[in-house]
Amino acid sequence: MTASELEQTAWHNVRSFTLFRVFFTARFYYPVYALLFLDYGLTLSQFAILNGLWAVTIVFFEVPSGALADTLGRRKLLIIAGSCMLMEMAVLLLAPIGGGTWLFTCFALNRLLSGIAEAAASGADEALTYDSLKAAGLEGRWGKVLERVQRDTSLGFFFAMMIGAAVYDPQMINAILVFFGQSVSVDQSDLIKLPIFLTLLSAVVVFWMALRMQEAPREEELGIRETLARCWRETGVTARWIWTTYLPFCIILAAMVLDSVIRQFLTLASEYWNVINLPIASYGLIGSGMALMGLFVPRVARILAEKRTPLQNFITTAAAVFIGLVGLGFAIPYWGIIPAIFLYASIQLTGFFVSRYLNEAAPSKQRATVLSFRGLSTNFSYGILSLMYSGLIVWIKTQERGAIVGDASQQSIFVESLQWLPWYFLVCLGLVFVSQHLRFGNKQSD
C-alpha cells in the first residue's frame, strides 16, 4: 500500500474505533441496571450470582481472547464482540418477565455473552487502531486519538444515562404521550424492555463498525489446532515479557491498585449519595455529570503524558485518589460529592495513562495480548477487593453488636467501611513500590 493509502486506512480505523467504543459503552439500561433485573422478576441473590458470573467470564476469557486477536486477527475478535453484544441483548428481549428458572437461565446466558463480548473487545480495538496508525507513521497521534475517543465515549455515556432513565419512567413517557395528543398510557411493566431495545440498536452499530475495520492480511492462515497452540504460546511469551520488562510490569501493577479501589466506590455510589442526603432523582444526573468530565480530563491526561514521566503521573493520580477516599470517609451531607469528583476524574486519568503507555511499549505482535493482561489484572484485583470489602462489612457488624438499629445502623456500617479504604490504598501503594524494587532494583526507566 502507498503512504497515502496507509494514512487513509488509519483514519478510517480511527473513526470506526471511536464509534465502536461509543456505542459499546452506551448501554441504556445502566441507570436502571439493578432495578431492571429485579423488575424482570429476579431476586437480589440471583442478581449477585449473575454479576459474579459476568466477572468470572471476563477473567476466564480475557487473556486467551487477546492472544487470539494477535494470532487469528483483531478484526475477527471485534466481529465476535459485536455478535455477542447483539445476542446478549436479543436474549433479554426474548426473556419472559417473571419466568422463574427459564428467566434466570436467559439472564445467565446474557451475562456469559456479555463477558465474552467484553473480553473479545478488550485490547483488540486499541491494538488494531494503533497498529494502523503506526503503519502510516502516525503513532505519535495516538494520544490525541485517545483523548477524542474518551471525550466522545463520555458524551455517549451521558446521553445513554439520561435517555435510559427517562424511557424507564412511566410518568415521563405518559407526559410525552399527552403532549403529542395521544390518549394511550403506559405503566412500568410496559417499559421494562425499552432500554434493552435501545441497547440492541447500539449493538447493531457496534457490529457494523467491527465489519468496517480494516486490518492488514495475516502472513499465513493457520488451522484451528495451530491457532490455539500459537495462542497459548503467545500468552506465555507475553506473560514473560511483562514479567521481565520494567515499564509494563509497573504500569499493570499501578493499574491494579488505582482501578480496583475506584471501581469499588463506583459500585457503592448510589448508597453513598443516599448517605450524604442527595435525592434519589439526582442520581442519574450525577452519573451523567460525572461522565461529562470526559470532555476535558483526557486532554489534561494527554498534556501530562507528554510533559511528565509515568512515575510522576502515577504519583499525581494516586494523590488524587487518596484525597478522594479520605473525603468519602467524612460523608459530609451534600458537599460529600466533591471527593467523589476526585475519584471519577482519577478513573479517567488511569484509563488514559495505562492505554497510552502500554500501547507505546508493547510489540505490535503482542499488543492485544498485553492489553488483555491489563484487563485480566484489573478485574482480578477488583474481585479480590470486593471479597475483602464483604469481609470488612461482616467484621464491622460483629463489632457493632446491635448498638445501632435499622437504617441508621446500615449507614453507620457503610460510612465506617469507607474510612478503611484510604488505608488499604496506602498499603497497596507501598506494595507496588516494594514489588518494583524487589523485581528491578532502583531502575527508573526501561
Residue ranges and their predicted role:
Residues Q188-I192, I196-E226, S435-D446:
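Helix-loop junctions on the cytosolic side of multi-pass membrane transporters
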